[in-house]
């Protein structure tokens, strides 16, 4: 079992700094230079360099472009030096760091000595010293406290990513030594939450894996903090380091990550750990895992989920389900979703893709054949059933392929003036939900020449809502990756909290729709089961019980399986 800390990965300050430089890179204006590495993570630095975002370190003053102050902040002297270069200057200093700078400046003006509890030489600490008017000193341990004058008046602040317990201990020592002491707890909330969760997680598992750059101070602190609980701790920078870990006889593994660690690195580590742990299991278990991964990665499982949702929609509308329509629907889903997965590789490339995305690249020829064969089968079935269904499936496949390969098509055919469907806010979520709704509800109903009823409208809303919820679940998992590659998904626009409110509202609204529909009470209960499942999945995902990679997709599709199975059970029992 793998448990992933909810706080693992980017903090607010890092995400904000990334958002700023990525937005600047999208709007143009020449090369972008950051005053030192934007964040302490080699994978992110490499990705930014490929986007033309480079560090000023080791370079002369640039003659064109713009300069960005990184999240760690800078001293007033350094800020003035950057201004003298003469290029536009943008400030990506973390707001929490800026607050500490203001506190240091305030008390330095009043003549207080400034005791900064932090790491000597760290960029944030060096910037804070610049605001201390020569009255600052770095406190890294008890020996530094002894150097303070007993008659001094001291203001104590902390590096925002400092060890909470070390800060409290040193602050108490300083208060006991000097005549006047003002203690300002400036450790940021995300750091406190990350450390608190890491300690709790470490106490509940057999081993801890901390993911992050070797030169990241906050990652190193997490390693130390977890180690103090007595659990075995491993520090890895990527999934390549996992193969050397000794995990024999380990049943529960906790995973956390530093504030500069991107999502795809965490997911690759979780996937690799899952594969390593599975090797310790019996042969039958390993075989079942491989079969499950194959079904999910080829989207056969997604096709089965779509068929289950189709059967639930038929029961919702009181129309009979037809085997040819179910088979054609499943084949159409495989074609479109596989094409999207195959085309998706390259948005994050050169090592930033997850192991699942890497799988689609390594097997792209065989998977492309499966996608083409599935598309052909769906169109052949549709043509034999009805011309309307053929046109419906053909339109869905063409639109799906265009959306997936739009970037490559645009390079060959310059007819859209540079406009991209991918840049339309929430376009993927709406497109996928609409496509499933058309294939599952509208197409079969047009074929049957059935009159349009309120229950048909409700069925459209039911299918659209469930697929929309599934799509947002996926977007929440990939929010940081989507921000980096410029995808305008709901989470990148609304933030995590705003998206969670939308999810909650969608679930409540869908339950209300089911209850308001003119269908028997038994079937109402059956059709409401998927929302209970989604709520449970959402609650567990917030706690970050990590399934990892493809298994997360399988769990999200589980609501469709539940919809079909529960509706069929109620129908077979004579309750619908």
What is the role of each PLM region?
Residues 354, 422, 526-576:
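Extended hydrophobic alpha-helices typical of membrane-associated regions
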Residues 293-316, 369-374, 432-440:
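The first (N-terminal) embedded transmembrane alpha-helix
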Residues 331-346, 395-410, 438, 462-477, ...:
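Transmembrane alpha-helical segments that form the membrane-embedded catalytic/substrate-channel core
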């Amino acid at each position: 079992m793998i448990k992933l800390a909810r706080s693992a990965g980017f903090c607010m300050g890092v995400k904000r700094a990334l958002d700023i430089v990525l937005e600047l890179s999208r709007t143009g204006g020449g090369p972008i230079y950051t005053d030192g590495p934007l964040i302490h993570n080699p994978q992110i630095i490499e990705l930014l360099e490929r986007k033309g975002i480079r560090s000023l370190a080791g370079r002369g003053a640039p003659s064109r472009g713009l300069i960005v102050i990184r999240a760690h902040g800078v001293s007033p002297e350094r800020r003035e030096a950057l201004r003298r270069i003469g290029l536009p200057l943008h400030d990506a200093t973390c707001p929490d760091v800026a607050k500490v700078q203001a506190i240091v400046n305030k008390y330095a003006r009043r003549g207080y000595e400034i005791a900064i509890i932090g790491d000597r030489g760290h960029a944030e600490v060096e910037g804070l010293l610049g605001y201390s008017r020569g009255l600052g000193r770095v406190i890294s341990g008890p020996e530094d406290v002894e150097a303070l004058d007993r008659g001094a008046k001291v203001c104590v602040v902390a590096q925002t990513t400092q060890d909470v317990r070390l800060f409290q201990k040193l602050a108490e020592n300083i208060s006991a030594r000097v005549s006047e002491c003002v203690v300002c707890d400036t450790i940021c909330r995300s750091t406190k939450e990350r450390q608190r969760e890491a300690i709790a997680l470490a106490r509940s598992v057999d081993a801890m894996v901390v993911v992050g750059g070797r030169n990241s101070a906050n990652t190193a602190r997490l390693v130390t903090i977890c180690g103090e609980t007595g659990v075995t701790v491993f520090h890895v920078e990527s999934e390549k380091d996992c193969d050397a870990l000794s995990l024999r006889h380990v049943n529960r593994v906790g995973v956390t990550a530093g504030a500069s660690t991107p999502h795809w690195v965490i997911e690759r580590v979780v996937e690799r750990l899952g594969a390593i742990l599975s090797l310790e299991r019996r042969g039958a278990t390993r075989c079942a895992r491989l079969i499950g991964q194959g079904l999910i990665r080829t989207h056969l499982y997604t096709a089965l989920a779509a068929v289950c949702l189709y059967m639930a929609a038929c029961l919702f509308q009181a129309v009979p389900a037809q085997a040819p329509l179910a088979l054609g629907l499943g084949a159409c889903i495989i074609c479109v979703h596989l094409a999207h997965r195959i085309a998706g590789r390259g948005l994050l490339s050169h090592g930033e893709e997850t192991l699942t995305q890497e799988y689609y690249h390594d097997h792209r020829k065989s998977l492309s054949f499966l996608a083409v064969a599935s598309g052909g089968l769906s169109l052949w079935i549709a043509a034999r059933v009805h011309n309307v269904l053929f046109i419906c499936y053909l339109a869905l496949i063409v639109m799906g392929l265009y959306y997936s390969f739009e970037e490559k098509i645009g390079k060959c055919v310059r007819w859209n003036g540079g406009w991209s469907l991918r840049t339309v806010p929430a376009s993927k979520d709406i497109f996928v939900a609409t496509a499933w709704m058309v294939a599952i509800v509208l197409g079969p109903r047009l074929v049957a020449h059935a009159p349009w009823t309120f229950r048909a409208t409700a069925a459209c809303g039911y299918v659209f809502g469930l697929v929309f919820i599934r799509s947002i679940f996926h977007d929440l998992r990939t929010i940081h990756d989507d921000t980096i590659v410029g995808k305008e998904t709901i989470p990148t626009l609304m933030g995590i909290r705003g998206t969670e409110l939308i999810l909650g509202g969608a679930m409540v609204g869908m339950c209300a729709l089911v209850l308001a529909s003119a269908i028997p009470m038994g079937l109402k209960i059956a059709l409401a089961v998927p929302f209970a499942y989604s709520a449970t999945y959402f609650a567990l995902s917030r706690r970050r019980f990590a399934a990892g990679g493809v298994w997360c997709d399988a769990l999200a599709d589980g609501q469709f399986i539940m919809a079909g199975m529960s509706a069929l059970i109620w129908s077979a029992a004579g309750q619908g």
